[in-house]
Amino acid sequence: GVGNFDPAIRSIRDYTAMQFKDFVQDKIPVLGICLGMEMFFAKSEEGKEKGLDVLGGEVVLLPNNMKIPHMGWNSLDIKKESKILDGVDNGSWVYFVHSYRVKPLDEQIVVANADYGISVPAVVENGIYFGTQFHPEKSGKVGSLMIRNFLRVCKK
């Protein structure tokens, strides 16, 4: 959800002596929402702490010529099939509150973008890792469907 990169990363590291990757062991599906998704990456311009680095890439500030934070509804441009986007129509509207965007090393993990003057990766999926830059919990029926889809993945 909403927060700052460094305190969020420290809270995970302080929670357990195990490394995050060792804890989930490529078996436990993980959904990162907004900051949670950003924490999947190696580093963020927002802080000095190392990210979880389960998805290669970095997190960068939205360009300063844009209104920051990006707050409000925006539509999804779905690029490929995704387990959490099952049944979600291309062009569906979702709710964003963010100042940063992810820059994955592997663009293939981006399954949907949003247009905010630039293309913003809105949904990423790679193995057990699922991330949304927007807030599905604030995105009405579409967001509820995505959360149900994720829970279905968890049941398998």
Regions found by a protein language model. Give the residues of each.
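Short, surface-exposed beta-strand/loop micro-motifs that present aromatic residues
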Residues: 118-125
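Pocket-forming structural segment of enzyme catalytic cores
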Residues: 42-118
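Beta-strand-turn-beta hairpins that frame and shape the catalytic cleft
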Residues: 91, 125-129
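Histidine-centered divalent metal-coordination motifs
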Residues: 34, 98, 135
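Short amphipathic alpha-helical segments and helix-helix/interface helices
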Residues: 17-21, 85, 147
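Acyltransferase
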Residues: 132-156
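Cysteine-nucleophile active-site neighborhood
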Residues: 2-72
